[in-house]
């Protein structure tokens, strides 16, 4: 929940290295994390941290689409939101911020003004690169057919997407007749844009098992003793010791710390929570709890992030085949998407690094080769992928997939450009053929594989 400090614009020399003359940029896919937010639950009120934060000015400016009675006319309804909670006598009271604020008060896990600012700035940075510097996208848009935008059903993800779009194409860059953009969402049970333990029983089993293993490894260590020395006195009576599986969990403690770091002095914890060694320990354990499964288990990769990566690669191959599977059918436009952006959470971005080792109803399009495994393709089908490359960048840093390092699996002279064929081959291994069916399979099987199944190959 703390802000990435972005680098400045790329120089011309950097652009030449990132985008070699012998290659032509064809498709950009951006996976963004939602912006800064308030904590998802109220913690450490005994340490002076107020449960309700005054950083959500959008609460004064809410807008809803309303339909007039006996008419098909729609009118935007502007309204102001205030939050209500329990008072000391269990009666209703208006939630207040640290200084008694009743407006601008955030709900739990809500995108804050800071989060809106940074995601809008992300859109501006993307415009600078893909519009101004590379000329890949148009300066002025008359429609949004070339865009594929998707967000999870969590409001902060959708709002972050909207802010990023606004930063990339502010009002002056949209023609007066430009229709509103289409943003794709799914129901929670169908969502694969984040690791969906709520919609996938088997993945819930796996994630709990890896979390428990982390607890067994770390709860009785010197590192955990140090955390208890620092902040144990603020733990609740019902769970006095800091632990991976305490209440609040260690990951929940990290959530609150990071949220406070991203915002103002009115919502800060005591200085012990920001001890550098303590923060490093919390982050190390949190990464193990949440992401080690991707490194060790192909089933974990498949159910946790495989559906999303299958979609990502399908759109890459669809862009090569020009068969509509690059997002054209979903958006209902006439032109194939050139730029795709999805808004989710930290668990998606970090999960993607880990797996590499590091609307309007339309008729379904042709299956093509996008969802076929590489091993099932004919020579003619496989040849369609020749000459296309995939590169991953994470927070402006180029990432090289281990399985793409061998000769013939990358662009000569640059291992970061993986051949589309090899990238698809790696992703095929953990792309579920039937995600919902697989989520109900192996429920009696062990959570851990017999031997570790390394990621990135």
What does each model-identified segment do?
Residues 1-148, 152-340, 346-457:
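Signature for phosphate-centric chemistry
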């Amino acid at each position: 929940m703390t802000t990435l400090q972005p680098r400045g614009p790329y120089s011309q020399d950097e652009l030449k290295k990132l985008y070699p003359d012998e290659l032509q940029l064809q498709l950009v896919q951006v996976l963004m994390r939602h912006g800064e937010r308030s904590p998802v639950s109220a913690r450490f009120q005994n340490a002076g941290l107020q449960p309700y934060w005054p950083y959500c000015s959008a609460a004064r400016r809410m807008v809803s689409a309303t339909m007039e009675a006996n008419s098909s006319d729609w009118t935007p309804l502007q309204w102001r939101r205030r939050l209500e909670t329990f008072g000391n006598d269990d009666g209703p009271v208006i939630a207040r911020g640290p200084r008694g604020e009743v407006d601008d008060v955030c709900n739990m896990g809500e995108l804050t003004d800071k989060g809106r600012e940074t995601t809008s700035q992300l859109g501006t940075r993307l415009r600078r690169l893909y519009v101004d510097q590379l000329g890949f996208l148009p300066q002025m848009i008359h429609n949004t057919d070339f865009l594929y935008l998707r967000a999870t059903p969590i409001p902060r993800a959708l709002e972050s997407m909207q802010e990023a779009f606004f930063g990339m194409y502010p009002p002056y860059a949209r023609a007066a007749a430009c229709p509103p953009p289409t943003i794709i969402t799914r129901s929670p049970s169908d969502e694969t844009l984040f690791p969906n333990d709520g919609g996938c029983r088997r993945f819930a089993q796996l994630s709990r098992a890896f979390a428990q293993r982390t607890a067994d490894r770390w709860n009785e260590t010197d590192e955990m003793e140090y955390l208890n020395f620092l902040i144990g006195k603020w733990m609740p009576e019902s769970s006095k010791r800091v632990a991976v599986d305490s209440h609040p969990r260690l990951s929940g403690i990290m959530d609150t710390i990071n949220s406070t770091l991203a915002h103002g002095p009115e919502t800060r914890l005591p200085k012990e929570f920001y001890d550098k060694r303590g923060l490093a320990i919390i982050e190390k354990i949190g990464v193990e709890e949440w992401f080690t499964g991707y490194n060790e288990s192909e089933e974990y990769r498949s159910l946790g992030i495989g559906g999303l990566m299958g979609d990502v690669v399908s759109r890459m191959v669809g862009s090569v085949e020009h068969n509509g599977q690059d997002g054209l059918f979903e958006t209902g436009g006439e032109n194939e998407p050139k730029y795709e952006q999805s808004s989710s959470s930290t668990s998606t971005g970090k999960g993607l690094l880990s797996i590499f080792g590091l609307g309007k109803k339309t008729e379904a399009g042709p299956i093509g080769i996008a969802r076929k495994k590489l091993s099932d393709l004919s020579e003619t089908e496989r040849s369609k992928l020749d000459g296309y490359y995939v590169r991953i960048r994470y927070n402006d840093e180029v990432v090289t997939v281990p399985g793409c390092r061998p000769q013939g699996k990358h662009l000569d002279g640059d291992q970061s450009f993986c051949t589309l064929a090899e990238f698809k081959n790696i992703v095929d291994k953990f792309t579920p053929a039937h995600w919902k069916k697989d989520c109900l399979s192996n429920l009696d099987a062990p959570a851990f594989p017999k031997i570790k199944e390394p990621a990135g190959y």
